[in-house]
């Protein structure tokens, strides 16, 4: 029997970030709705052509989204909060749900599992669902008519969709009965339209599962697939399926897709427990998350073992390709060849699947490949420092209460001190100067002069707004990780390696190919210049080791712990130099602290062990008079508040404005006695919040948090916002702080 290939999650942004440009042009009234949708359809067809031409057999559809695929499902099933009903245009309503408007707060946005992709959390009010728009059918028809190809529509399954809404299990069970008819109607319509195969993504199946969840899933798919002629495949990824035997042998579907790269236990389960003889095994053998070339020898060995269990195998990627840039070819001449030859992005994954298929079906020889060797980029001094770390001795002294008193006496800050997270708006002019400098159109001297002028502007604006602790604005930084990766040894920066983070926001994850170390200052010059302009304290701001690691592509030959420690030691040198040069507040941003948390509970303690140590390693040797801040993005804060406390940062700011109720509930059960700033407004939306809105958040916060420890700040950096809305929002934030201080007089 000849095996086939399929893929899923191909990047939707376009090879030249066409989606980003079209979205931002539409939001800025530069193009019409018709033009935006024409771009979308063009990208859908273009992506399908790329997959088709690579030799992949089963081509996916319904994977394109104008903003987020979970939001697409909310709109498709009419899970639209009532506050958005006043917007009559469906497309504008869709974007308002994602981004908010001046009058309407956006839906919450959070990380998708343990990735750096953000999704829009469903906000389910009515508990009534209806199939309003059949987007999967529309895209199936578009590709059928354009390319004469029958595609495999991809949808998110009901279990994962409801779990993504962050509901308790009682509500998930109740809503599953309500949403099932809408899903059923969708599948019936696809079946009637000639769809032969459908992929239903249920990555929530890799989480730890209770017995009632297993029963719910079994019942859902029994009803969902009843009477259908199309083949239903359940796709899982990011980890091994939980309750393998109970689910895989009982769910009424045609096949299962398993991650055999990050879910090693899947392979063990198949080999020891077997696989249903009447189902297809979709083997995820090429990685959707890391950029390293597939080792064909290892994969062929694994497939030989799988063929002893079942001959019904289809080859695929392990997880959505959306986490990879589009092609390595776009980096030729930019990244050195010996590093480039180690890499494989989305298009190369398609090629790898075809190579494997031909080797199995036709006996074609596998191409000769040198093994990936990171050791040639090693540094003995770095290895020596890592081996001498005493993890039990990484502690700050004295205790927090004494340190904080010393710091606040020295800094002379008022009650409810105000600050921002770090970045200020990066205008077109800022981006142009940076591009001109990188392309050799202006000199380093001209570029630095411009950056220093922007720093002067930012400091002046902050002083005029009467903000207490200032920042330099980060105008020299393209991205909070890329900036440090460019300056540290051991990282490669791509030129076109864009990956979608959310909506129109794209990032370029650096590639860690060797040992990491610091051979020059990273932030000192800009920070000292800003401090020279003002008597107010200016924060030195750096991205922490865990976030740099999590938002990069790590090497695979050593542990993530060791990579994080290498980065932490490099950052520690920078922290101590900033302190030596007179900077009194240093912020180590760790927005991805929780993001890399293993999905299985039994693997989480080990993760927290090295992530906490990485932060402490960066900060433990500073003076007690130096105040250490950290910033984190919200994601299930309640579950990890004790781990965040263990970082022993003097002040933490949290991205919490879209989920403030959930954040505050954490403090009802945990006495957090360090400094804390809960973001008082949402920077992901262009709306300017009122003073009253912010005061309400502060009041709720200080009912649970000691007011002497409470800081007031936005919930994230301001890089993506415009100056007008930034100044207006910060003005209201300072007014809110002053109003709170007056009450305490």
Curated annotation (Swiss-Prot):
Q: Which reaction does it catalyse?
A: 5-methyltetrahydropteroyltri-L-glutamate + L-homocysteine = tetrahydropteroyltri-L-glutamate + L-methionine
Could you list this entry's UniProt keywords, alphabetically sorted: Amino-acid biosynthesis, Metal-binding, Methionine biosynthesis, Methyltransferase, Repeat, Transferase, Zinc
Q: Name one GO molecular function term.
A: zinc ion binding
Top-level division of the source organism's lineage: Bacteria
Tell me the residue numbers annotated for binding L-homocysteine: 421-423, 474, 589
CDD domains per UniProt: CIMS_C_terminal_like, CIMS_N_terminal_like
Q: What is this protein called?
A: 5-methyltetrahydropteroyltriglutamate--homocysteine methyltransferase
Tell me which species this is from.
Thermodesulfovibrio yellowstonii (strain ATCC 51303 / DSM 11347 / YP87)
Gene encoding this polypeptide? metE
């Amino acid at each position: 029997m000849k095996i086939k290939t399929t893929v899923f999650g191909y990047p939707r942004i376009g090879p030249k970030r066409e989606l980003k440009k079209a979205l931002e042009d539409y939001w800025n009234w530069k193009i019409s709705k018709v033009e935006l949708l024409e771009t979308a359809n063009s990208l859908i067809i273009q992506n399908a052509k790329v997959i088709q031409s690579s030799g992949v057999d089963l081509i996916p559809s319904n994977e394109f989204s104008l903003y987020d695929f979970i939001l697409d499902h909310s709109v498709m099933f009419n899970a639209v909060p009532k506050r958005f009903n006043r917007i009559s245009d469906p497309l504008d309503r869709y974007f308002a749900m994602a981004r908010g408007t001046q009058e309407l707060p956006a839906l919450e946005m959070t990380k998708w599992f343990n990735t750096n992709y953000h999704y829009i959390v469903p906000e389910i009010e009515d508990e009534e669902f209806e199939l309003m728009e059949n987007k999967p059918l529309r895209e199936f028809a578009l590709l059928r008519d354009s390319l004469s190809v029958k595609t495999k529509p991809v949808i998110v399954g009901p279990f994962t969709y409801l779990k993504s809404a962050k509901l308790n299990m009682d509500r998930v069970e109740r809503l599953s009965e309500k949403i099932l008819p809408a899903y059923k109607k969708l599948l019936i319509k696809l079946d009637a339209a000639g769809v032969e195969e459908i992929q239903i993504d249920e990555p929530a199946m890799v989480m730890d599962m209770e017995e009632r969840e297993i029963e719910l899933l079994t019942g859902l798919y029994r009803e969902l697939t009843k009477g259908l002629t199309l083949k239903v495949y359940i796709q899982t990824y990011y980890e091994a399926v939980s309750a393998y035997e109970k689910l895989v042998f009982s769910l009424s579907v045609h096949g299962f897709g398993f991650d055999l790269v990050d879910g090693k236990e899947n392979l063990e389960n198949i080999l020891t427990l077997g696989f249903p003889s009447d189902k297809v095994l979709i083997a995820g053998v090429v990685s959707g998350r890391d950029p390293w070339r597939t080792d064909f020898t290892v994969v062929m060995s694994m497939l030989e073992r799988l063929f002893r269990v079942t001959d019904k195998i289809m080859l695929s990627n392990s997880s959505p390709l959306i986490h990879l840039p589009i092609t390595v070819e776009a980096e030729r001449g930019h990244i050195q060849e010996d590093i480039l030859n180690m890499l494989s992005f989305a298009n190369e994954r398609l090629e790898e699947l075809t190579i494997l298929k031909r080797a199995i079906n036709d006996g074609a020889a596998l191409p000769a490949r040198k093994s990936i060797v990171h050791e040639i980029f090693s540094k003995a001094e770095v290895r020596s420092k890592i081996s001498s770390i005493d993890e039990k001795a990484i502690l700050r002294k004295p205790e927090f209460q004494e340190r904080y008193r010393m710091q606040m006496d020295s800094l002379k800050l008022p009650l409810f001190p105000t600050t921002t997270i770090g970045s200020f708006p990066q205008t077109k002019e800022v981006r142009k100067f940076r591009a001109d400098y990188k392309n050799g159109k202006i000199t380093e001297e001209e570029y630095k002069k411009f950056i220093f002028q922007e720093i002067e502007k930012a400091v002046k604006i902050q002083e005029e707004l009467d903000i207490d602790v200032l920042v330099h604005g980060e105008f020299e930084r393209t991205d909070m990780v890329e900036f440090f990766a460019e300056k540290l040894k051991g990282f490669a920066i791509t030129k076109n390696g864009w990956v979608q983070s959310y909506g129109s926001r794209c990032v370029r994850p650096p590639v860690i190919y060797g040992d990491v170390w610091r051979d020059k200052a990273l932030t000192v010059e800009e920070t000292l210049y800003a401090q020279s302009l003002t008597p107010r304290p200016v924060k030195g701001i750096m991205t922490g080791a865990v976030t740099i690691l999590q938002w990069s592509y790590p090497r695979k030959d050593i542990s993530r712990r060791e990579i994080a420690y290498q980065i932490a030691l490099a950052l520690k040198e920078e922290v101590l130099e900033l302190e030596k040069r007179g900077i009194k507040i240093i912020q180590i941003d760790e927005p991805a602290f929780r993001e890399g948390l293993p999905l299985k509970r039994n693997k989480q303690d080990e993760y927290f062990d090295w992530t906490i140590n990485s932060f402490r390693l960066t900060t433990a040797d500073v003076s007690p008079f130096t105040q250490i801040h950290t910033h984190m993005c919200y994601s299930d804060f309640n579950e990890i508040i004790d781990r965040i406390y263990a970082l022993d940062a003097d002040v933490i700011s949290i991205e919490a404005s879209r989920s403030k109720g959930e954040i505050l509930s954490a403090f009802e059960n945990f006495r957090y006695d360090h400094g804390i700033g809960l973001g008082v407004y949402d920077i992901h939306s262009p709306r300017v919040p009122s003073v009253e809105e912010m005061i309400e958040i502060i009041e709720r916060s200080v009912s649970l948090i000691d007011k002497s420890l409470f800081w007031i700040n936005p919930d994230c950096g301001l890089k993506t916002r415009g100056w007008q809305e930034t100044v207006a929002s910060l003005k209201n934030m300072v007014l809110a702080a002053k109003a709170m201080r007056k009450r305490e007089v």
